[in-house]
């Protein structure tokens, strides 16, 4: 059987070691004679899963004690509404950094609840999209918080700087880059991330929130999105997505076994450099993002002759290189190379790209 590598932007590839373990214990989890999917979320066995997964995540990200970790439903789109309704308080404005598709989607949702101060930080020089340095962002004085998306999956644009905005509350959508490298949690008020890219399977959403921000929710906010309600109930206000939570916990253990986030940073940089090197080598392929803002997680690329796209994708699929079609908004190709993608998968892709260019260039 051909080795398959899944380059999907999400739901994305999971570590093979995690899948093997889940397969082994699927029908008889911890000797109970049932699957983890079938046991009560309030059972002592699942409570152990919840406690261990939070501890492992705190260890990986070095989450300070004054932050709550919430395991939620709804994906990042639910958080687009939850953030303003939890954090605005008596204010009517927040700073929203517009750096791409997902940042703009958060802005559109926030407009239902407040008047966002939209700050476009994109640059366009010589056909390349980039992001202004954070020191140039024109933040307002009266904003309840500053919201931005560090990694745009569709455009392949990354903001690699860590925020340093004094006492401003910083909110970040880390859905596509969480756990890919170390970050300083103390610089943020809220971090949220859909699980289906770099954490685990779809259905789980991670929220990390500083404790002093709890208890300010709008009265019309549904309880299931209220950070304080979720924190007070240890993410068990209603039945959580238990299987996704369990699998994410296995991913956290796998990450620790691999050497933690410093090791993942090295691996992710090596994978990205290999792929961008193949794209830049001759001009047959091209990436339209400024080098300083190229994403390590999502690498879009095009060919000068777009008529070859369908052939490229068909031949790649036949070689076991799956889900390389670009987002419908951007077209072209896109390789998502999250933590679970081994460098062997990127090498297989770059070898195929070189061979395709040799035959069609």
Curated annotation (Swiss-Prot):
The modification N6-(pyridoxal phosphate)lysine is found at residue 197. Pfam families: Aminotran_5. One of its GO terms (cellular component) is cytoplasm. Signal peptide: none annotated. GO terms for molecular function: O-phospho-L-serine:2-oxoglutarate aminotransferase activity; pyridoxal phosphate binding. Coiled coil: none annotated. Keywords: Amino-acid biosynthesis, Aminotransferase, Cytoplasm, Pyridoxal phosphate, Pyridoxine biosynthesis, Serine biosynthesis, Transferase. NCBIfam families: PRK05355.1, serC_1. This is Phosphoserine aminotransferase. It comes from Yersinia pestis (strain Pestoides F). The gene is serC.
